[in-house]
Amino acid sequence: MSKTIPIVDAQHAGSAYQHVPGHPDPQLSAVAKGTPTGEYLRRYWQPVALSADVTDRPQMVRILGEDLVLFRDKAGRPGLLYPRCMHRGTSLYYGHVEEAGIRCCYHGWLFAVDGTCLNQPCEPEGGLRREAARQPWYPVEERYGLVFAYMGPPEKKPVLPRYDILEDLEEGEFIEVISGGFVSYADHVEDPNVPYHWLQNWENIMDPYHVYILHSTFSGIQFAENFKILPRVDFEAVDGGVIYHAWRDLEDGRQLERINSALFPNISAIPMIDLSPGQGRWIGWHVAVDDQHYRGFFAARTRQPGNFAPIKMHNGKSWTELSEQEKQDFPGDFEAQFGQGRVTLHGEEHLATSDHGIALLRRQMKQQIAIVQQGGDPAGVHFNEADALVRIRSGNFYTTSDKTETAAD
């Protein structure tokens, strides 16, 4: 006996009753150790804190789904350790930091920043077998005012990259860094861990069309007046990431070319949103805290502080000054991205031609994930200093009839 298949007439097509909820892409959503994306992200150095925030007071940090204790010993060396003491499991968050490392509050076992157990005061001769009680640890290095950790296979540890726009500072220049907040130009938030998936924020870098709608027409002018011009866009897969060129024909006869970059595994390079001309001067890292949170770290080359001051989103108010009704009426990046859910349901998406950059970035990222799964080294990972300088491509460039404007301080 054949099964009767109900026919839905046009009047009832699209009923929510018939909707089958989608699901996140499992290859992209999970960041824990052993997952495809988790192992991919662990092959790169990840910022975990501002250098200035790492002191001799232990602090808990959560990165890539792991809870860890971060501190700086009295000799000035940062350390990142598994928090449960290898003696009987007490948290090293309650430890005291000394010249050589961190001492557990319970029975006084002392661990160096590389996890070596240096002293067991209740044991004969300070612990005859203390070398067997090594505390799990991750290597850390400091650069650009940030503390970076490598959380991948030890035998695959790359050199810490350098970025050309943050190198060879001229007299009077310095690097300004911040952490937290859902986007570099918005308010800092009390909890630096933003409550949704890191990829929802990072892939936004390759979506120039949302700037035309969300930031320029739907919610009024949130950035610069010329963003309300619909651009012509070209996306390009490059070694180490994806970039786009967006061209706008301005009313004064000039043409504006804007270049954004998304670099593996989670780096963004965006020029000034006031559209001032010249090479971009800052980069950001969109670091996965876990599957449902991320944290931003940003570094800017500058001569003046205040590069990350909050913008005025509406009626002269910054984001934290807006009421909930104003955020509903004039949403920005946080509302659009958090509105997708803690982890978006990729299975429900209907990507269109304007999503070419998103599709390209995801496809390129999946290729890098596959390389890691096959035992290879993903793009942007290098094992000698000579190859570790990364060229950043971003900027606002104005073309006139006789020249291109490129410089701005």
Swiss-Prot record:
Keywords associated with the record:
2Fe-2S, Aromatic hydrocarbons catabolism, Dioxygenase, Iron, Iron-sulfur, Metal-binding, NAD, Oxidoreductase, Plasmid
Which Cys pairs are S-S linked?
none
PROSITE patterns named among the record's database cross-references: RIESKE, RING_HYDROXYL_ALPHA
Rieske domain mapped to chain residues: 45-149
Cofactor binding description: Binds 1 [2Fe-2S] cluster.
Pfam families linked: Rieske (PF00355)
Q: Name one GO biological process term.
A: catabolic process
Identify the residues that bind Fe cation: 210, 215
Q: EC?
A: 1.14.12.-
Determine if NAD is one of this entry's keywords. Answer: yes
Instruction: Provide the residue positions that the database annotates as binding [2Fe-2S] cluster.
Output: 85, 87, 104, 107
Q: Which domain of life is it from?
A: Bacteria
Biochemical pathway: Aromatic compound metabolism; carboxydiphenyl ether degradation
| Cofactor or coenzyme needed | [2Fe-2S] cluster; Fe cation
Output the SUPFAM superfamilies linked to this UniProt entry: Bet v1-like, ISP domain
Q: Per the entry, what induces it?
A: By 3- or 4-carboxydiphenyl ether and by phenol.
Q: Which GO terms describe its molecular function?
A: 2 iron, 2 sulfur cluster binding; dioxygenase activity; iron ion binding
Biological role stated in the UniProt entry = Degrades exclusively diarylether compounds having carboxyl groups in the 3- or 4-position. Yields a hemiacetal that spontaneously hydrolyzes to phenol and protocatechuate.
- Assembly behavior: This dioxygenase system consists of two proteins: the alpha subunit (PobA) and a subunit (PobB) that acts as a ferredoxin and a ferredoxin reductase.
Family, as annotated: Belongs to the bacterial ring-hydroxylating dioxygenase alpha subunit family.
Q: What is this protein called?
A: Phenoxybenzoate dioxygenase subunit alpha
